């Protein structure tokens, strides 16, 4: 279990772009389960869409990538303060299945598929109340800053 203070040790992101509120399960080298609470106060809703707020798919992808980054950093025993950064390197097989709206709790799940020379591949999904909202295969690269 990781609260937002510990999450901030493993992700360089800050408001309004820190998209993981809590980690509820993490098995180093294997998987992570985290969540993001979606509130009407999200900056993105000022433009997407003011009269019918929908959390953008690209933000769901970013949230899955951030959860994957935490898993990668914890697995490697590194933190951004050590001079490492985890970069979003690619995304494949993206599917959006359900809108995510204010009041939803977006559960983020990521599983390590492979790692080779600092390039990590993750199978990710985001759900709301057990219903699939999005899925993707995400590539991240561990690089020195």
Curated annotation (Swiss-Prot):
The active site is at residue 48. Its main location: cytoplasm. InterPro entries: FabA_FabZ (IPR013114), FabZ (IPR010084), HotDog_dom_sf (IPR029069). It is an enzyme of class 4 (lyase). GO terms for biological process: fatty acid biosynthetic process; lipid A biosynthetic process. GO terms for cellular component: cytoplasm; membrane. It is found in: Cytoplasm. The keyword Transferase does not apply. Its EC number is 4.2.1.59. It catalyses: a (3R)-hydroxyacyl-[ACP] = a (2E)-enoyl-[ACP] + H2O. CDD domains: FabZ. GO terms for molecular function: (3R)-hydroxyacyl-[acyl-carrier-protein] dehydratase activity. Keywords: Cytoplasm, Lipid A biosynthesis, Lipid biosynthesis, Lipid metabolism, Lyase. Pfam families: FabA. Involved in unsaturated fatty acids biosynthesis. Catalyzes the dehydration of short chain beta-hydroxyacyl-ACPs and long chain saturated and unsaturated beta-hydroxyacyl-ACPs. Belongs to the thioester dehydratase family. FabZ subfamily. PANTHER family: 3-HYDROXYACYL-[ACYL-CARRIER-PROTEIN] DEHYDRATASE (PTHR30272:SF1). This is 3-hydroxyacyl-[acyl-carrier-protein] dehydratase FabZ. It comes from Cellvibrio japonicus (strain Ueda107).
């Amino acid at each position: 279990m990781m609260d937002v203070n510990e999450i901030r040790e493993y992700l360089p992101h800050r408001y309004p772009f820190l998209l993981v509120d809590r980690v509820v399960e993490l098995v180093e080298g294997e998987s992570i389960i985290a969540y993001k609470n979606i509130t009407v106060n999200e900056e993105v809703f000022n433009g997407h869409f003011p009269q019918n707020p929908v959390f953008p798919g690209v933000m769901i992808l970013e949230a899955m990538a951030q959860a994957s980054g935490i898993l990668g950093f914890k697995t490697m025993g590194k933190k951004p303060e050590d001079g490492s950064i985890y970069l979003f390197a690619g995304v494949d097989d993206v599917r959006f299945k359900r809108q995510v709206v204010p009041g939803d709790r977006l559960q983020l799940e990521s599983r390590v598929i492979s790692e080779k020379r600092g390039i990590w591949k993750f199978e990710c999904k985001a759900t709301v109340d057990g219903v699939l909202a999005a899925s993707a295969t995400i590539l991240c690269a561990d690089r020195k800053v």
